[in-house]
């Protein structure tokens, strides 16, 4: 973290972004706030134990919300809702448990009236689950938590998609992109249609003619 966070801050500064506060997930575990949040869900009757793990009744929470929204039991059944593990059999809490605690902290401790998250579209399946967990805690996630999904971007160079792979470590970072394309062009391309999957044409971004 001591190496990566300063690099992140430097890269974001080049893009024109500065965060006012950095929050460490580890602080939630060290303070016992994750355990306290899970205990709060248990006190409200929204957890159960199975196979040595502690589970959140996600399917029940979401079904209750959907019924209030007018969905029929038949329609809800077709969704195949599933429950989520909060604490594994080995005693370690899941990322989802920490995520619930983090958002509970924003509402219940830091006093946020509204929280807006910006996520990649590949996390769309997590939206209803997190909102539901806030509802289960009495924090009105349906109205106080907004989640904006940003689509993924394909980089195109000389008419070919630039192939990237997590497995092989082949990637183009933001700072790599800013070495090739002016920051204003990057910001324009990314903000033009954030809700739509797009191709970022590196050649077009630096071209100075009527097509750009």
Question: Where are the regions a protein language model picked out?
Answer:
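A contiguous, basic/glycine-rich beta-loop/short-helix subdomain that forms a polymer-engagement track
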Residues: 33-108, 134
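Conserved alpha/beta enzyme-core scaffolds, especially Rossmann-like or related mixed alpha/beta domains
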Residues: 1-51, 106-120, 143-151, 197-211
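Short, internal active-site loops enriched in acidic
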Residues: 27-30, 60-63, 153-155
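Short, electropositive, low-hydrophobicity segments enriched in small/polar residues
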Residues: 20, 56, 95, 124, ...
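Catalytic adenosine-cofactor/nucleotide-binding cores of aminoacyl-tRNA synthetases and other
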Residues: 103, 107-212
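Alpha-helix N-cap/helix-start motif at coil-to-helix transitions, marked by capping-box chemistry
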Residues: 2, 6, 94, 179-180
């Amino acid at each position: 973290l001591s190496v990566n966070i300063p690099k992140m801050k430097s890269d974001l500064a080049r893009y024109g972004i500065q965060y006012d506060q950095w929050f460490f997930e580890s602080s939630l575990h060290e303070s016992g706030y994750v355990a306290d949040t899970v205990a709060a869900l248990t006190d409200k009757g929204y957890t159960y134990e199975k196979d040595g793990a502690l589970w959140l009744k996600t399917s029940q929470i979401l079904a209750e919300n959907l019924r209030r929204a007018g969905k029929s039991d038949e329609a809800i059944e077709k969704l195949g809702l599933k429950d989520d593990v909060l604490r594994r059999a080995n005693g370690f809490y899941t990322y989802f448990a920490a995520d619930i605690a983090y958002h509970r902290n924003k509402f219940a401790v830091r006093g946020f009236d509204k929280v807006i998250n910006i996520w990649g579209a590949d996390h769309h399946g997590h939206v209803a689950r997190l909102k539901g967990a806030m509802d289960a805690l009495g924090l009105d996630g349906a109205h106080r938590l907004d989640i904006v999904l940003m689509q993924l971007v394909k980089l195109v160079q000389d008419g070919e998609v630039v192939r990237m792979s997590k497995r092989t470590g082949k990637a183009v970072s933001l700072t790599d992109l800013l070495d090739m394309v002016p920051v204003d062009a990057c910001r324009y391309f990314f903000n033009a249609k954030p809700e739509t999957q797009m191709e970022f044409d590196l050649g077009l971004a630096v071209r100075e003619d009527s097509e750009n």
